[in-house]
Amino acid sequence: MPKRKKQNHHQPPTQQQPPLPEREETGDEEDGSPIGPPSLLGPPPMANGKPGDPKSALHRGPPGSRGPLIPPLLSLPPPPWGRGPIRRGLGPRSSPYGRGWWGVNAEPPFPGPGHGGPTRGSFHKEQRNPRRLKSWSLIKNTCPPKDDPQVMEDKSDRPVCRHFAKKGHCRYEDLCAFYHPGVNGPPL
């Protein structure tokens, strides 16, 4: 690095300023050329790194301080990177789902760790339990023993069907897994 600084100190700043617009233009192109990333490592930070250069004083602040080399890095590359390689890197090319919000090493949106959390997981389990109960009652009631086809199962030990209690009927009728007073058990 010190060798590069010495070499760049001998070059006039007017020669270093024209490559910056060229790099911005090539960084905006869609060809994906690797010209954008070397601008961070190459001459542009070195050209503005001169403490006596009046153009570097505009970008860095106080001309005598050599410490803040990071502001030129942050102020120069974002024009080519903001419209070019970074957006493409976070977009559909790197992410298989075409969404750049998760970043480059992002997981797919649904199998990720946040989807199977305790609140959503318990919600899905609570939602599936009545379905399992209904499917079990469908299997039990549609496949009765061959010797006794018309026997109603006594479900008085099960909870009362909410819909039957409110409306007086249930759309599942005798296939419902819950207790219908007077229909699939003794009346209350």
UniProtKB/Swiss-Prot annotation:
InterPro entries, per this entry? PRR3, Znf_CCCH, Znf_CCCH_sf
Keywords attached to this Swiss-Prot or TrEMBL record, sorted alphabetically, are:
Metal-binding, Repeat, Zinc, Zinc-finger
Is Zinc one of the keywords?
yes
Which spans does this entry mark as compositional bias, Basic and acidic residues? 145-157
Q: Which GO terms describe its molecular function?
A: RNA binding; zinc ion binding
Q: Where are the zinc fingers (C3H1-type)?
A: 155-183
**Name listed for the protein in its UniProt record:** Proline-rich protein 3
Natural source organism: Homo sapiens (Human)
Q: Which gene encodes it?
A: PRR3
